[in-house]
Amino acid sequence: GYQDKSIKEITREMFDLADGMTMSAKKDGIVNMGGFIATRRKEWYEGAKGFCVQYEGYLTYGGMNGRDMNALAIGLDENTEFDNLETRIKQVEYLAQKLDEYEIPYQRPAGGHAIFVDASKVLTHVPKEEFPAQTLTVELYLEAGIRGCEIGYILADRDPITHENRFNGLDLLRLAIPRRVYTLS
């Protein structure tokens, strides 16, 4: 059992089991841009490093400035602290409760950093060819100034051979919860 282990210990053990990982650090790394690839396999490293230099920057910084690398290190540390994780989860739960009150459908269970609203069920009058999640994303911003992100048909891109839109899967509006805000104050 893990009930007596710290989040840092659980995280360390989890990553010890992986051959490799990627992370977009914009959310839980508390930086404005960046991320990383980590691997213990030499051949994966050798295969990836050429792309780093070509597209991102030298291997030691990958296109990130020193300030963002320092912020990422702090963010990774802070996000293995129980109090921070608990606060974040409670923020997401709070939004989920509000959506429940208004019977707005979303993916359950609620996540650790975001809520995914089922746009096809909210905008039933918008056909899939008019991209319900993108429509909801735009309208929510115009009406309330709330910035979300479409995770669905547009993100799925078009079929590379037929160039037709791909409409299989879900069409969701992601509402990522900002960090370090006074949600309930």
List each model region and its residues.
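Conserved PLP-enzyme active-site core in the AAT-like
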Residues: 1-101, 127
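Phosphate/diphosphate-binding loops
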Residues: 23-29, 132-144
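Short, glycine-/Ser/Thr-/acidic-enriched flexible segments
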Residues: 26-29, 41-44, 77-79, 112-113, ...
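Short, conserved charged micro-motifs
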Residues: 45-46, 124-132, 180-185
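Short acidic (Asp/Glu) and glycine-rich catalytic loops that position anionic groups and cofactors
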Residues: 49-52, 69-78, 113-122, 168-174
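PLP-dependent enzyme catalytic core of the Aspartate aminotransferase-like
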Residues: 79, 143, 154-185
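Conserved glycine-rich beta-strand-loop-beta hairpin in the small C-terminal domain of fold type I
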Residues: 89-93, 107-119
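Short glycine/threonine-rich loop-to-helix capping motif typified by GTGT followed
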Residues: 116-131, 160-166
